[in-house]
Amino acid sequence: MSDGYGLLKGKKGIIFGALDERSIAWRIALACKREGADFVLSNAPIALRLGTLNALSEETNAPIIPCDVSSDDDVKDMMEKVKAELGGVDFILHAIGMSPNIRKKKEYTDINYNWYQQSLDISAISLHRILHHADEAGILNDGGSVIALSYIGAQRIFSKYSDMNDAKALLESIARNYGSRLASRGIRVNTISQAPTKTSAGSGIKGFDGMYTFAEKLAPLGNPSADDCADYCVAMFSDLTRKVTMQNLFHDGGFVTNGISEEMMEDLAKLYSEED
């Protein structure tokens, strides 16, 4: 692992959501280790069986604490284990998202409501549950930083993203709400709206390749990679951003503020001329 700058030297944290080496959370874990942090890794038991988290654990010397973030008892128990392992924590990464409706290719107007509730609970309400039980266990260190990964679907409708548009909107609202309540202790809570990224999770979304190409063509800087996102998260976990909180921070190469690119105009002109 290459040398870093020591931006997180002496800091301890929890990283939720790493599945395999393509995961954004996986790349964030590597970057945090590079910068001197110690942390625990966590994911749902079923994800641990499907993924390769043990390899990341060995590479970063980070213990794994399984946790079903939809269960109060599980999260409460996990925080006690974190307390025993690390004492307090200086940062938390929430990189958790799941939609049975998307996986089952249900249209938004015909979603299964039980699955819908699962999507909201696991992808968004889990952030509230994690912060509540971490605070209750007394492991949130003053001056800490919490980051949850979001997507522009929280503000704009991407039809194939279905109920995850709603889940990300709720996630961002929870981050703002909790951020206002933890600010008196210097604890920051933000979301990072990452561009479409080629991960195992993203590949499960119908039309993902089209979303990725669209964003790549429209963003002036192009789509940032998982490693780019990891470096951004390191900055947000560090003391260099201690006055940034309750924000949704777009990390998308300029996609959110661009109108249309020359490349896209040329592609559209060709497409429409072919149709004529």
Go through each PLM region and give its residues.
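C-terminal helical subdomain
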Residues: 125, 191, 209-244, 249-253
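Short C-terminal tail/terminal secondary-structure segment
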Residues: 245-276
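Conserved mid-core segment of classical short-chain dehydrogenase/reductases
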Residues: 57, 65-76, 80-85, 91-117, ...
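Canonical Rossmann dinucleotide-binding motif of NAD(H)/NADP(H)-dependent dehydrogenases/reductases
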Residues: 4-42
